[in-house]
């Protein structure tokens, strides 16, 4: 589990590339290329990168979108990437957003989750694969293992805006199964892409989402273990809840970096420990996301990627008749769901 506010300087040592390393004029020109700020086609799949996955090298960057929503601006520009599938050479557009900002300057409680989800939906996104570094709460989930959670326990403290439906309109959406099982099945089937001695993909688990940015106390860590918690992070919520409200199929992929502080045979979690495992996880994360995108791009998953199974679901959660919506709430929801309301 990560103390994100203290990672900023440490992260820069892995990401900064001095100009002296650029060995040719061609390379320099490439780094200075300005990407278009528009993209005309709908983009159905998005990857939200957290600590440990801040970029997707090997994909072709084709646009960089700066979008302003009624809930503000997202945490980073949305990069549109082209991915060429390995099995059929099909080119798939993917949106990439960095949850904590381009320079990892946004703490977990400061992430503009509503703007992130709204901006992605506005360009056509209906499926999100979200990555997050996590602490392990169980012996069998080792550092460098991956986990596909199927449940979450909310331990945030109410300081993060968590709904699109407020200020004159009320809606209650089901959240009994917080992740999309259809997308999860596709993701689990891609575990073969992970490499490294002893690396395991755990296909289910309960994720504890805590407030942060501080680490857990030992008592808290043991409490979460007693609840059956598998892993812990600071990023899943309200991201997953907002995706559900926005009718987007959402699945998180967790990358274990440490045993939190409950494990008596290891030292307490430190930034250095986390970053060592994170660096090892990064290459596996890129292999994994490539395999997942290949699978999602197949024709058999076309309806899944477009989230046809959740389309229209928010209308059943509305508690406020449209005639009674406030003008401000209506304007925001019409931006999020254009042409959706009577």
From Swiss-Prot:
An example Gene Ontology CC term for this record: cytosol
> How would you classify this enzyme at the top EC level?
transferase
**Molecular function terms, GO-annotated:** mRNA binding; S-methyl-5-thioadenosine phosphorylase activity
* Main subcellular location of this protein, as a coarse class: cytoplasm
Q: Which InterPro entries match?
A: MTAP, Nucleoside_phosphorylase_d, Nucleoside_phosphorylase_sf, Purine_phosphorylase-2_CS
Q: Where are the transmembrane segments?
A: none
Q: Do the record's keywords include Iron? A: no
Source domain of life? Eukaryota
Instruction: Indicate which residues the UniProt annotation says bind substrate.
Output: 234, 258-260
Q: Which GO terms describe its biological process?
A: glutamate biosynthetic process; L-methionine salvage from methylthioadenosine; purine ribonucleoside salvage
Cite the position(s) of the site with description Important for substrate specificity: 216, 271
Q: Where does phosphate bind?
A: 51, 99-100, 132-133, 235
Show the Gene3D superfamilies listed in the entry. Nucleoside phosphorylase domain
Q: Where in the cell is it found?
A: Cytoplasm; Nucleus
Catalytic activity line of the entry: S-methyl-5'-thioadenosine + phosphate = 5-(methylsulfanyl)-alpha-D-ribose 1-phosphate + adenine
Task: Give the EC number.
Answer: 2.4.2.28
The record's NCBIfam families line, in alphabetical order, gives: MTAP
Reported function = Catalyzes the reversible phosphorylation of S-methyl-5'-thioadenosine (MTA) to adenine and 5-methylthioribose-1-phosphate. Involved in the breakdown of MTA, a major by-product of polyamine biosynthesis. Responsible for the first step in the methionine salvage pathway after MTA has been generated from S-adenosylmethionine. Has broad substrate specificity with 6-aminopurine nucleosides as preferred substrates.
Q: What is this protein called?
A: S-methyl-5'-thioadenosine phosphorylase
From which organism does this entry originate? Aspergillus fumigatus (strain ATCC MYA-4609 / CBS 101355 / FGSC A1100 / Af293) (Neosartorya fumigata)
């Amino acid at each position: 589990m990560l103390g994100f506010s203290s990672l900023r300087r440490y992260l820069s040592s892995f990401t900064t590339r001095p100009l002296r390393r650029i060995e040719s004029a061609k390379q320099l020109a490439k780094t200075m290329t300005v990407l278009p700020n528009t993209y005309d086609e709908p983009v159905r799949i998005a990857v939200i990168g957290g600590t440990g996955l801040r970029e997707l090298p090997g994909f072709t960057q084709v646009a960089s979108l700066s979008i302003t929503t009624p809930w503000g601006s997202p945490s980073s520009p949305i990069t549109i990437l082209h991915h060429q599938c390995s099995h059929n050479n099909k080119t798939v557009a993917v949106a990439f957003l960095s949850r904590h900002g381009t320079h990892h300057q946004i703490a977990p409680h400061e992430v503009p989750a509503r703007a992130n989800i709204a901006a992605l939906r506005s360009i056509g996104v209906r499926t999100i694969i979200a990555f997050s570094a996590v602490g392990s709460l169980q012996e069998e989930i080792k550092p460098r293992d991956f986990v596909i959670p199927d449940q979450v326990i909310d331990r945030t403290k109410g300081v993060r805006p968590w709904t699109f439906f407020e200020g004159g309109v009320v809606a209650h959406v089901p959240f009994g199964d917080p992740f999309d099982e259809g997308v999860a099945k596709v993701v689990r089937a891609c575990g073969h892409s992970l490499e490294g001695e002893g690396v395991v993909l755990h296909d289910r688990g309960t994720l504890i989402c805590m407030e942060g940015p501080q680490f857990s106390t030992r008592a808290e860590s043991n409490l979460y273990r007693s609840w059956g918690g598998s892993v812990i992070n600071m990023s899943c919520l309200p991201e997953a809840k907002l995706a559900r409200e926005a009718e987007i199929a959402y699945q998180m992929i967790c990358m274990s970096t440490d045993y939190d502080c409950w494990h008596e045979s290891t030292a307490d979690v430190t930034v250095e420990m986390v970053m060592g495992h994170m660096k090892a996880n990064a290459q596996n994360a890129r292999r994994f996301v490539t395999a997942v995108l290949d699978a999602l791009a197949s024709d058999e998953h076309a309806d899944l990627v477009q989230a046809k199974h959740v389309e229209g679901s928010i209308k059943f959660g509305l508690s406020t008749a449209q005639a009674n919506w406030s003008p401000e709430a209506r304007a925001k929801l019409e931006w999020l769901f254009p042409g959706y309301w009577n």
